Amino acid sequence: MTTHNNNFGAGAAQMTLIGLRYLSARKLRTALTTLAIVFGVALIFAINLVLPSALSAFQLSLSAVSGADIHITSTSGEAFAPETVLPSLTALDSVRAATGILSRQFSLPGLTADTAAQITLIGIDPAQTVRQFAVSEGRFLQEGDTGVAVFPAGIAELAPELAVGTTFPLVTAGGLKLYTIVGFLAEQGNPSAPEIYVSLPDAQSALNQPALINTLELALVAGADRDASSASILQTLGDGFQLNAPAGSSSILGALEIGLALFNLLGLLALFLGAFLIFNTFRTVVIERRHDIAMLRAIGATQRQITQMIVIESLVQGVVGTIIGLVFGFLMAWAGVALMGGIWETYLNRGTLSLEVNLSAVAVAAGLGIVTAVVAGYLPARSAGRTSPLEALRPATPASVQHAARWSLIVGMGTMLLSVGLLLFTDSNGAATGALLFLTGMLIAAPSLVLPVARLFSPLLTLWFAREGDLARGNLVRQPGRAAITASTLMIGLATLILMAALVISFGDLVRKLADVNFSSDILILPPTIAVYDAVVGADPALAERVRALPEVATVGTLRYAAASTPVTDLQVLGIDPVDYPQVASFEFAGGDAESIFAALGSGHNAILTSIALSTLNLAVGDDLVLQTPTGLQTYRIAAVGNDILSFKVAAMFISQDNLAADFHKAEDVLLMVSLVPGADNAAALAGVQTILGDYPQFTGQLTGAYREELVNVTAGALDLFYGLAILILIPAALGLLNTLTINILERTREIGVVRAVGGSRGQVRRIVTAEALLLGIFGAAMGVFAGVAMSYGFILAFGAIGWEMPYTFPVMGVIAAVVIGVLLALGASILPARSAAQLDIIRALQYE
């Protein structure tokens, strides 16, 4: 037994040594294969550094400096009546004191010269029963104070002219209001979102939340067990409350988390293509080393040792590629944060964006990189280990190659026919499956298509390359499996490009369609951020009344906001007036007529859900939806599914403004839409609106037509970024082409020597390699076009499952770009291998083994 183990250990060491020597002897191939892992790991690592850093910066900007032991908020983050919970909390033995505060973080125009700054307005009880405030200058708030504020010392960095006794303008729901500064805190506070303290009644008035709070602060008795106290407090509160979570801003957090998931999918796709490249490389390596493997088997190497040798090679490349990828990923993340920092602070005002390295990001990227390399190398390794010595020494016969190609054609065509049936004759739920099946069928059928494609384009190559084209075709069809896998790598990249092109076109059409349907007003009164209303100070009904009083105005429709939670997801709850709103805007309804739907909204607890909300909650029209609100559990009946341009990308629901006020205590208008009387002068009406908005600097007025065009153009510009992402996906495809051509040169070294020995010039050898690369590029581009069209059609139909009925537009420019890029990639990838082949020494090439 000991002897057997020693022999096994010695054999494993020998196989490891042979594998390492093989990698070191073929440096270019090893480097190209390793680069695929480097790229995928770097992309995933960078994404998992940048977006979590953004999440962390955002969450930090929400956190107030506090000496309280425990914070309590509603699960929705909305304000609630303190008398519903305060008496039961103060009765607990572990609670020394409790107080309510009302806070909101929002953008404050004019705090700095260049941009609006982010501040946190906090209304508190001046009694300081829970935490103490040290003042460095002036005094703190006192009982009965109104119209006064206390600022943090760090405010001097933003507005050095402020001093005790000066006045400061704050935006409120009732318009701009001046507050007198009575003191500065000793603490610097959060410099990215300074905390301004006012009395609780002043905050309730400023935020139009009379007699409400959104946070309870608790101080525990000395020596109380924090965990036990927290459990007791939660039990006392019941459902609808949470401990130590910042109030509000769930919409931005959700958007950042969705962005993290989407970009991770991009990184995984890049890593998948890298795995495809490694699989192709090791499959080719096994074919090239058939004689070496046969000799090793003949002198006693076991199947396990052969498999082990090739797996070790893939493991080494995976480890090296992962280490290099982590370094490059960190550099990419550092550059990304540097580029995003200015935009983050200028437009989001959500803290300072800085790069944070976390072990989970390292572990995820490293684990995926190493595991991907080993898994991709294992299948060729197992195939090599199962090869007998005689089988390895025997060259593949044309009959066996044709037999394998025949079966790949039958299975591949059958899979593609099934996918076409799913694409054409099923609903949106089966469309994505059909698209993926078509791609799978193309991958399976690819080896059988090598010869027909080579014959089809051979006359074209003959025109460009004369006799070299025939030699290139022969080289390609000699190993159809290798050519198919290489072309398939290119196919996936080009299909992704076509898919992106189709999605950009169709999504742009959807946005334009929704904009035309929804924006039927003449003037829009807009908050600083659209569709993310957590950090918006709206206006009380007085603003809408003042606008209605203008002689040019016919109707004013308003939008109000609240947040709600369900066991499945958080929801935006938007309040509209069922009578006024249809006169200034509408929805893209998925069934039913608008008049009856709006009528239902005005009676009882009925709601319109966006398609995203409906699919996320897995509900249907007519079902009941139970929401956790500041007033407890409320049940709403789903009256319809409707999308509008501002909320179709989020989980949102629309209810009447009466229900919003009763269930959520919200009566702020966060967006106003104005329709003018026929024949009114738009410019004059806008001027009148802007005069009124001088008292409400948190809003801006714009003509609806101009804003519609701006929104469509901004969306189109943002969608164009997806083309850049698709180009990134093509990098592994280019590496695959370069790798395959390089391996072909090494495998055919003696053959190239013979060509040179019988009179072939260096230029002819170079043209042979270029022609072969061009054939591979054309083959991959052709498959990419078919796969890309099928995938784009299927995935666009699949969006119907979440209610996005996007029209399919054939991506003509995407197809043309894919073909051109495929050919250019092939020609570019051929430069180095062609030069290497042309420079081979004839004598050494003939002696090569």
Language-model segments: residues:
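Hydrophobic, regular-secondary-structure patches
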Residues: 34-120, 164, 228-235, 483-572, ...
